Curated annotation (Swiss-Prot):
Keyword rRNA-binding: yes
UniProt entry keywords in alphabetical sequence: Chloroplast, Initiation factor, Plastid, Protein biosynthesis, RNA-binding, rRNA-binding
GO cellular component: chloroplast; cytosol
Keyword rRNA-binding tagged: yes
Function, in words: One of the essential components for the initiation of protein synthesis. Stabilizes the binding of IF-2 and IF-3 on the 30S subunit to which N-formylmethionyl-tRNA(fMet) subsequently binds. Helps modulate mRNA selection, yielding the 30S pre-initiation complex (PIC). Upon addition of the 50S ribosomal subunit IF-1, IF-2 and IF-3 are released leaving the mature 70S translation initiation complex.
Signal peptide span: none
Domain S1-like: 1-71
Name listed for the protein in its UniProt record: Translation initiation factor IF-1, chloroplastic
Species of the source: Brexia madagascariensis
Family to which the UniProt record says this protein belongs: Belongs to the IF-1 family.
Gene3D superfamilies linked to this entry: Nucleic acid-binding proteins (2.40.50.140)
Domain of life: Eukaryota
GO molecular function: ribosome binding; rRNA binding; translation initiation factor activity
Amino acid sequence: MKEQKWIHEGLITESLPNGMFRVRLDNEDFILGYISGRIRRSFIRILPGDRVKIEISRYDSTRGRIIYRLRNKDSNY
């Protein structure tokens, strides 16, 4: 059975080494996010200030996988 995950939107606040980022979620929580393989293969640039969709495991809510970078028109803000 596939693991259930939460999907949230957030803002990249800090870039860390090895494709890791500090992400502030819309509910004001800070988590550590890493780039998914699909984004890494497509050479999509993620910079501080970008809005992203992040997938968070139910078992470890302090880390998440960045699955999509939102364009300005995709964002709610």
